[in-house]
Amino acid sequence: SIRNNITRTTPMTAKTHHYHTRTEWTGNLGVGTAHYTAYSRDHIHRAPGKANIPGSADPAYRGDPARWNPEELLLAAASACHKLWYLHHCADHGITVLAYRDDAEAEMNEAAGRMTAIRLKPRVTISAASDPALALALHHDAHRDCYIANTLNCPVTIDAHIEQA
């Protein structure tokens, strides 16, 4: 496994990107937050020009299990960021990726009030002409460059598997 123990510094000439979202609570059932069980945890995440994402709390906290909760969104962000960097590095190094799937997992310790571990488990299929050892090694570069992993305050481990077509 590759562990998130890389310190990232930003060059002085690096471009700054800005992101804007709106989270709108849609769970007022008529009496607002008059008491703990009087309201729904449902909300909508919005961003200009994008499809809305229905959200709620984890079902353990009275959330709707059919909607994305913040913990799942955080895990999905870590997984997607790693995947995007991995594909970038593969393209740069002549590795042809044909398929990529990550069944990522996260652990949250309620007493600690934070995520305590994220485990990415990418399963990658590469072309027969691609080097599987290099394809595996490029997960380290992707992890090093992943903005989300570099932002998180919990270990992010990578348990990658490479298969040739």
Labelled PLM ranges:
Residues N4-A76, L84-A165:
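Extended beta-strand/beta-hairpin segments
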